[in-house]
Amino acid sequence: MTVSKFVQIRRDLHRIPEIGFKEWKTQQYILDYIGTLSHEFVEVKTWKTGVIVKVNGKNPEKIIGYRADIDGLPITEETGYEFASIHEGMMHACGHDVHTTIGLGLLTKAVSERIDDDLVFLFQPAEEGPGGALPMLESEELKEWKPNIILGLHIAPEYAVGTIATKEGLLFANTSELYIDLKGKGGHAAYPHTANDMIVAASHLVTQLQSVISRNVNPLDSAVITIGKITGGTVQNIIAEKSRLEGTIRTLSVESMKRVKSRIESIVAGIEASFQCEVIIDYGAMYHQVYNHEELTREFMEFVHKQTDMNVITCTEAMTGEDFGYMLREIPGFMFWLGVNSEYGLHHAKLKPDEEVIEKAITFLSQYVKWKGNRK
């Protein structure tokens, strides 16, 4: 069956998922496609494994930005697609292939239907980690092309195709990775009194961490600590000398993130004293909350409702993490959910976005950009 140009682009990208700052094939694919759009008013830069494209407007007064994340996840794909990932153990399980395709489609429209204002497209690596938005924002490559307004999207499996969802103000949570290493003294299982058991210490720590949420965070201000991985020990009859916890912290407010981390550190100090061990905390990557500019978001929602065939709804905050929050901290703009009607959710090995969304998104975003970027 013949598919449209942009559906084929999405499938091409889906085959080559790459993890953060290793998106070399993806970068080259984007550059090759941009090369087919060559015009004297199009400028291209690379930044690490990302791509920055500027379409110079006819009579610019501002720069409008669109950000698309381009990286995949370390997940083994189970979609059954004919165009499934060719990279073992990697998959576009968060829809970044769709985000990138929509960006290339919007870029194509921008070249053929040039507007007054400048447009900058940020094809950003490493959203899934360690985080590409903040260093890209601070890069020399973007300094002269820094947008005055910026928008981004994320696919939403739970919403129907043709629906977008967003809200003014806080949309996504503050998030932080959490790694805790415990080191004690190993020994024979028959002589526990001669050792410091780090499996037991880690177990106590996991349960105590949950009290941070129930007893140290305002019930009206959501927060979550998830320990997703525990490792420790070697065999069944040796008391573990080491153990490791890996997880995430998510809070709706910056203040709660600070409070949660402070309490974690206090609890860890207690574990060290109780079990006579050494505990090291590493917070890893932290993503700033996604906070939509109220006026721009309201204006965008009204435009979509009145001038496009898309359905726009107001959603609630999500505990999702997104490094686009760093861009919105410095640049007025917004992010929205884009419905893709998938039975399986984000980060699932069977995620299958409905490809009908691609043309719809390119069309309505192009309408918005022309409305926003042309003199009235």
UniProtKB/Swiss-Prot annotation:
Enzyme class: hydrolase
Pathway(s) the chain acts in: Amino-acid biosynthesis; L-lysine biosynthesis via DAP pathway; LL-2,6-diaminopimelate from (S)-tetrahydrodipicolinate (acetylase route): step 3/3
Pfam families: M20_dimer, Peptidase_M20
Keyword Transferase: no
Protein name: N-acetyldiaminopimelate deacetylase
SUPFAM superfamilies xrefs: Bacterial exopeptidase dimerisation domain, Zn-dependent exopeptidases
Active site: 69, 128
UniProt keywords, alphabetically: Amino-acid biosynthesis, Diaminopimelate biosynthesis, Hydrolase, Lysine biosynthesis
Function: Catalyzes the conversion of N-acetyl-diaminopimelate to diaminopimelate and acetate.
HAMAP family attached to this UniProt entry: DapEL (MF_01692)
Reaction(s) catalysed by this chain's protein: N-acetyl-(2S,6S)-2,6-diaminopimelate + H2O = (2S,6S)-2,6-diaminopimelate + acetate
Family: Belongs to the peptidase M20A family. N-acetyldiaminopimelate deacetylase subfamily.
Keyword Hydrolase applies: yes
Entry's Gene Ontology BP terms: diaminopimelate biosynthetic process; lysine biosynthetic process via diaminopimelate
GO molecular function, one term: N-acetyldiaminopimelate deacetylase activity
Enzyme Commission no: 3.5.1.47
